[in-house]
Amino acid sequence: TKISKHGLGLAIDINTLYNPYVKEKADGSWHIEPATGEPYAFDRDNRTDIPYKIDHNDLAYRLFTEAGFEWGGDWISLKDYQHFEIDL
């Protein structure tokens, strides 16, 4: 069994409600975690009504990426706006 990056202390999820995990399914529908984060999952770049939104201007983004972490919001195949991880 492989231990996850979270389990190894190499990843963290921040404020999951406002920064959900979003992936398109094969049938064109969306998988969103947590499901209650759906109102915050789309058109994030143009919205100012999302409290605690992590984006490229956010302090959490700047601090984590400056420390060498990768942000899940930059991923192409899915968006994991809550997620930061680092490889050691």
Tell me what each language-model feature is.
Residues 3, 8-88:
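Catalytic cores and adjacent binding grooves of peptidoglycan-active enzymes
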